[in-house]
């Protein structure tokens, strides 16, 4: 087992991957020994060579291949050096022309750039805050006054107070709405007066708006339309004999449903006979917190 582990490296094309094999592999590959030339040697021209080149440059700035070869033979230099000299000479000539034009016309160049700056400055000043005319300055105040007038109490029609509306006679419907639109105990409290309260009164118009509010699911209780209450209550569409209170809505059973006229009985509506005072006496009103 140990001999299997200590076996030499596998051979790749007859060469192991050990250090000697890698050396043989590298030695088989040929690398260039001479380094690459980084830059050309700088050519120095003599005065005679420069005179010949300048004479040709005065004739033409772009000599063809034949002219360059002829000049190269005269000055004893390769044609590529002559081509590079003409290239550099044209660049030097363009630079001299730009410098001469820049020195001759410095002010027009500045004038060309100054209008752009002036326009930018004008645009920046225009972008700043400019005082609006007096007519537009009143706009925020007018809008503020409009909003104030919207929320001012004078512009809103006063909402009728339920308590003040209750001072009107009981025949008007506005007096009965704040009391009878509440839950069932409040409704019975509004009718909790003695039976003589309904005598001689036409309560048909008073109870007719309560027709949809008095309907409740559940078994109906004993009718409260008594002879002392008059025929108007029994014949009104809101007669409680047809609608009735649900046993589940008021939280008491049929055993607790005593006679409506019997005020001395133990009513389960959290008030006694002393609380059922005259409807018009506002000082004796007692509202139950629901």
Curated annotation (Swiss-Prot):
The record's region (Disordered) falls at 93-144
Which GO molecular function entries does the Swiss-Prot or TrEMBL record give?
DNA binding; DNA-binding transcription factor activity, RNA polymerase II-specific
Q: What is this protein identified as?
A: Homeobox protein otx5
Reported function: Transcription factor involved in anterior and eye development. Promotes the differentiation of both rod and cone photoreceptors cells in the retina. Together with other retinal homeobox proteins, acts as an effector of a cellular clock which, depending on cell cycle progression, establishes the generation of distinct retinal neuronal cell types. Acts synergistically with nrl to activate the rhodopsin promoter. Promotes the formation of anterior regions and represses the formation of posterior structures during development.
What biological process terms from GO does the record include?
anterior/posterior pattern specification; eye photoreceptor cell fate commitment; positive regulation of transcription by RNA polymerase II
Q: Which cysteines are joined by disulfide bonds?
A: none
DNA-binding annotation, residue ranges on this chain: 38-97
Q: Which PROSITE patterns does the entry mention?
A: HOMEOBOX_1 (PS00027), HOMEOBOX_2 (PS50071)
Q: Which Gene3D superfamilies does this UniProt record tie to the protein?
A: Homeodomain-like
Keywords per UniProt: Developmental protein, Differentiation, DNA-binding, Homeobox, Nucleus, Transcription, Transcription regulation
Q: Does the keyword Zinc-finger apply?
A: no
Gene Ontology CC entries for this record? nucleus
InterPro entries, alphabetized:
HD, Homeobox_CS, Homeodomain-like_sf, Otx_TF, Otx_TF_C
Q: Where in the cell is it found?
A: Nucleus
Q: Which domain of life is it from?
A: Eukaryota
Query: Which regions are flagged for Polar residues bias?
Result: 94-103, 116-129
Q: What SMART domains does the entry give?
A: HOX
PANTHER family in the record: CONE-ROD HOMEOBOX PROTEIN (PTHR45793:SF22), HOMEOBOX PROTEIN (PTHR45793)
SUPFAM superfamilies documented for this protein: Homeodomain-like (SSF46689)
């Amino acid at each position: 087992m140990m001999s299997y582990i200590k076996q030499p490296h596998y051979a790749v094309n007859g060469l192991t991957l050990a250090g000697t094999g890698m050396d043989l592999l590298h030695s088989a590959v040929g690398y260039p020994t001479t380094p690459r030339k980084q830059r050309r040697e700088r050519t120095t021209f003599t005065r005679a060579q420069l005179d010949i080149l300048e004479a040709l440059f005065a004739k033409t700035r772009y000599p063809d291949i034949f002219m360059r070869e002829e000049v190269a033979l005269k000055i004893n230099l390769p044609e590529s050096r002559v081509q590079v000299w003409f290239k550099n000479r044209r660049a030097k000539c363009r630079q001299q022309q730009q410098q001469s034009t820049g020195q001759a016309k410095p002010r027009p160049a500045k004038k060309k750039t100054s209008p752009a700056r002036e326009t930018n400055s004008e645009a920046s000043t225009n972008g700043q805050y400019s005082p609006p005319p007096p007519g537009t300055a009143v706009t925020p105040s007018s809008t503020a006054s409009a909003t104030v007038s919207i929320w001012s109490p004078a512009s809103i029609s006063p909402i009728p107070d339920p308590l003040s509306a209750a001072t009107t006679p009981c025949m008007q419907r506005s007096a009965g709405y704040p009391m009878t639109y509440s839950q069932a105990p409040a409704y019975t409290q509004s009718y909790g007066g003695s039976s003589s309260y309904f005598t001689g009164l036409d309560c048909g118009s008073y109870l007719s708006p309560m027709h949809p509010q008095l309907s409740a699911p559940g078994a109906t209780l004993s009718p409260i339309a008594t002879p002392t209450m008059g025929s108007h209550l029994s014949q009104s569409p809101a007669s409680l004999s047809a609608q009735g209170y649900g046993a589940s809505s008021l939280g008491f059973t049929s055993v607790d449903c005593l006679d409506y006229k019997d005020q001395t009985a133990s009513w389960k509506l959290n008030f006694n006979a002393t609380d059922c005072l005259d409807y018009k006496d506002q000082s004796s009103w007692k509202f139950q917190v629901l």
